[in-house]
Amino acid sequence: MIQDEIKVSTQTLQWKCIESKIESKRLLYSRFAISPFRKGQANTVGIAMRRALLNEIEGASITYAKIKKVKHEYSTIIGLQESIHDILINLKEIVLKSESFEPQKAYISVLGPKKITAQDIKGPSCIKIMIIAQYIATLNKDILLEIELNIEKDRGYRIENLQKYQEGLFPVDAVFMPIRNANYSVHSFESEKKIKEILFLEIWTDGSLTPKEALYEASRNLIDLFIPLINSEKKEKNFGIEKTNESNMSYFPFQSVSLDIEKMTKDVAFKHIFIDQLELPARAYNCLKKVNVHTIADLLHYSEDDLIKIKNFGKKSVEQVLEALKKRFSIQLPKNKNYL
């Protein structure tokens, strides 16, 4: 019987948050358990997840501040308690969340006397300040302080060179690392007379996202790394060795089941990959979100003609989407519905 010939894996991974707490306003902690793994698998996943958490998750940060009539960062302003240098340090500590992949501008315009906090920062709706009570400066006199802030989204950290900035622009050593720490441990147990493993994963975040959100994003980023392998097409050269007799060469096993893999990729993997991974400009991204296109799978239901009919979605936005799909996932949308 066909049923007897098919071997189905009974190993279904399950995860559970077993501990969660707020250690401080800017430090969230959760501990997750993921199992069951076969022997050796938990360590492989643990290493990959920890590195993805620490290195692949984007964060938002202020990258520079523009203050008129100020020559250098150690300048002082009459009526302002802090030096410019102190203000820059305080700006660096502000925890932000950005829904845009494009640099954004925000502004501080305060008339003293007043204590200035992150709540006084005014910016676009795509920028969210996580701790509004974060201290910035104090005005002791009846003076106006105006600061323009540049906010970017990136990975890792960035130390700017002051010399490349014009007078009045002050770089901030930006930290784009919402994950403060990540650890894992592996423990063995016996199940059905077989040795299985359970992975414990600990995640600390700065509050701009929860540990659960971080776990999802790290998982999506790892999936993105392998999608191109699944979608890879035959090349004229394989690992740098020229094919002299194509009929005698053996290819990756993917190729013999390319149709099945393509269907699996569209039906399963793309449902878990959000359009954020396309890194589209804010205009194209926001237009897609307004018509409930949240994942790559949602986007695959559209043709080029469908996209251009979306409100405020111009030809340039269509080109940006097509280019991003081709670059990231080797996907080309059909011209019209007839080819879907």
Curated annotation (Swiss-Prot):
Residue segments, region Alpha C-terminal domain (alpha-CTD): 265-340
Protein name (database record): DNA-directed RNA polymerase subunit alpha
Catalytic activity: RNA(n) + a ribonucleoside 5'-triphosphate = RNA(n+1) + diphosphate
Ribonucleoprotein found in the keyword field: no
Phylogenetic placement of the source organism: Eukaryota, Viridiplantae, Streptophyta, Embryophyta, Marchantiophyta
GO biological process: DNA-templated transcription
CDD domains: RNAP_alpha_NTD
Entry's localization field: Plastid, Chloroplast
Record note on domains: The N-terminal domain is essential for RNAP assembly and basal transcription, whereas the C-terminal domain is involved in interaction with transcriptional regulators and with upstream promoter elements.
InterPro entries recorded: DNA-dir_RNA_pol_insert (IPR011262), DNA-dir_RNA_pol_RpoA/D/Rpb3 (IPR011263), DNA-dir_RpoA (IPR011773), RBP11-like (IPR036603), RNAP_asu_C (IPR011260), RNApol_insert_sf (IPR036643)
Pfam families recorded: RNA_pol_A_bac, RNA_pol_A_CTD, RNA_pol_L
GO cellular component: chloroplast; DNA-directed RNA polymerase complex; mitochondrion
Enzyme Commission number: 2.7.7.6
Region Alpha N-terminal domain (alpha-NTD), annotated ranges: 1-233
